[in-house]
A protein has these predicted regions:
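Glycine-rich, basic loop-to-helix element that forms the pyrophosphate-binding segment
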Residues: 2-18, 39, 89, 93-97
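Conserved nucleotide-sugar donor-binding
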Residues: 19-20, 98-109
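Short aromatic/hydrophobic "clamp" motif used to bind/position activated sugar donors
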Residues: 23
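The conserved acidic donor/metal-binding loop of glycosyltransferases
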Residues: 27-31
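Conserved donor NDP-sugar-binding/catalytic core segment of glycosyltransferases
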Residues: 34-67, 141-142, 146
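Short, flexible, basic/aromatic active-site loop/helix in glycosyltransferases
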Residues: 54-60, 69-92, 107, 171
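Catalytic donor/gating beta->alpha subdomain of glycosyltransferases that bind UDP-sugars
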Residues: 113-176
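Membrane-embedded multi-pass helical conduit in multi-pass membrane proteins
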Residues: 186-257
């Protein structure tokens, strides 16, 4: 038996007692397709990498809300593709829900920071990149990622992610990119549009256009399922407001301490 050190401690312990050239790190709520290991081997044979990761998607058996949340977390129109989409607005940082890394690199970097409650995987990926190691996105190395089953749970999850981004910015100021600020800008923008719309109702059209974009894109991705399309709009707003408010609150607390 080992003491419960959370996900980071467990992963670090597993890495220390492991053997082999590469480590595969996965979340407990992920399901692997049958071809996962074959895809990893094929991708590494084609392109060498010190660390790599792949996208996550929804399994056909997932319920409607899980599929909607999966859309919100992976769509280019909500995340800029930074979670592993083929289109992305930022350098690729492997995430712990689907990550591979050379064992010697993991040991040399001392693994995950066990003092961090949230954002420890981005912290680790940042140290990988700053250490001069290569990271690669392997689109074929995907996992089915089970999501929350309630929007309030999802809100709290992404709220913590927004807070973690500010904690990471304090450690690595140069890692904060425009794409990370977009949810906060979205929150302020939506509130501003709602207030200004009282005087100029046509401004609501801007918000409506974004809603329609999300609805059409999500409905198309889920083969014409209108219900999932509607839920995806709700999930997208939950994701953006959760991350955005967490980001703003953590930023405000940080600035007040200065």
């Amino acid at each position: 038996m080992i003491p419960n050190g959370g996900p980071s401690g467990a992963r670090n312990y597993g890495a220390r007692i492991s053997e082999g050239e590469y480590l595969l790190i996965l979340d407990s709520d992920c399901i692997l397709p049958e071809t996962y290991l074959e895809a990893v081997e094929r991708s590494l044979n084609e392109t060498e990498a010190d660390a790599f990761g792949g996208p996550d998607c929804a399994h056909p058996s997932f319920n409607a809300i899980q599929k909607a949340i999966s859309y919100a977390m992976t769509s280019f129109f909500t995340t800029g593709g930074i979670r592993g989409g083929k289109k992305k607005l930022d350098q690729f940082y492997p995430r712990s829900f689907n990550m591979g890394i050379r064992r010697d690199v993991f040991i040399k970097l001392d693994g995950f920071d066990t003092s961090m409650r949230y954002g420890e995987d981005i912290d680790f990926s940042t140290r990988i990149i700053q250490g001069g190691y290569t990271t690669r996105l392997f689109p074929e190395v995907y996992v089915y990622h089970k999501r929350r089953t309630r929007l309030i749970q999802f809100f709290r999850q992404v709220e913590h992610s927004g807070e973690a981004r500010i904690a990471l910015t304090q450690k690595y100021p140069s890692t904060l990119k425009i794409v990370h600020c977009l949810p906060a800008v979205f929150v302020i923008g939506v509130i501003g549009l709602c207030l200004l719309g009282i005087l100029c109702p046509w401004l609501y059209l801007l918000l409506l256009l974004y809603v329609l974009l999300l609805f059409i894109d999500a409905t198309y991705q889920y083969k014409g399922n209108i219900w999932i399309g509607m839920l995806s709009v709700a999930a997208a707003f939950t994701q953006l407001f959760g991350y955005g408010t967490g980001f703003i609150r953590a930023w405000w607390k940080w600035k007040l301490k200065k």
